[in-house]
């Protein structure tokens, strides 16, 4: 613990907490100040001046990062017949119907993404209390309720991320790993930032992005200047 505290202090000394860095500077600092002994994730966080209690100010969606996330996603698909076969051919890790519902209700959660065809949502809905709190419930807004299961599986395997503003207007997302080249992290960050800009509700007032930051799994938060993108 003492060693970790020393490493954290050393990392903090390299970051000016009063400064908002350019996206390139921030990415370089995030890599430099990471002291985890594993290939840590690089995460970005946005604090948005929105009121999610209003239906027209809720922000939620999905996108495919140009350079992926560096994480292998375990994809589960609820489908039957030809659609089940399409999901399997596309590389889904688990495909089924009621058998998967029973397995999940029994405590099994060894998957990262859940996709379903629209006709399967009646049985998937029974898993709301399990999947909902974990942000795993299929949703049309994130492209996880779809008839094109092959595309959904391929995107999930290829670097697709989902995002959602919480009650305080915070949005967080993983944009890669520390082992990524800096330019690839910058490209991913810029792609996600563009999505956040376009997601601004028409009814939002005042400064939309009140804070943007980047960090690693065990690193320090680094403020980013939104105008540098």
UniProtKB/Swiss-Prot annotation:
GO terms for biological process: regulation of translation; translation. Pfam families: Ribosomal_L1. It comes from the Bacteria. Keywords: Repressor, Ribonucleoprotein, Ribosomal protein, RNA-binding, rRNA-binding, Translation regulation, tRNA-binding. Coiled coil: none annotated. InterPro entries: Ribosom_uL1_bac-type (IPR005878), Ribosomal_uL1 (IPR002143), Ribosomal_uL1-like (IPR023674), Ribosomal_uL1/biogenesis (IPR028364), Ribosomal_uL1_3-a/b-sand (IPR016095), Ribosomal_uL1_CS (IPR023673). One of its GO terms (molecular function) is tRNA binding. CDD domains: Ribosomal_L1. One of its GO terms (cellular component) is large ribosomal subunit. Signal peptide: none annotated. Part of the 50S ribosomal subunit. Belongs to the universal ribosomal protein uL1 family. Binds directly to 23S rRNA. The L1 stalk is quite mobile in the ribosome, and is involved in E site tRNA release. This is Large ribosomal subunit protein uL1. It comes from Streptococcus equi subsp. equi (strain 4047). The lineage of its organism: Bacteria, Bacillati, Bacillota, Bacilli, Lactobacillales. The gene is rplA.
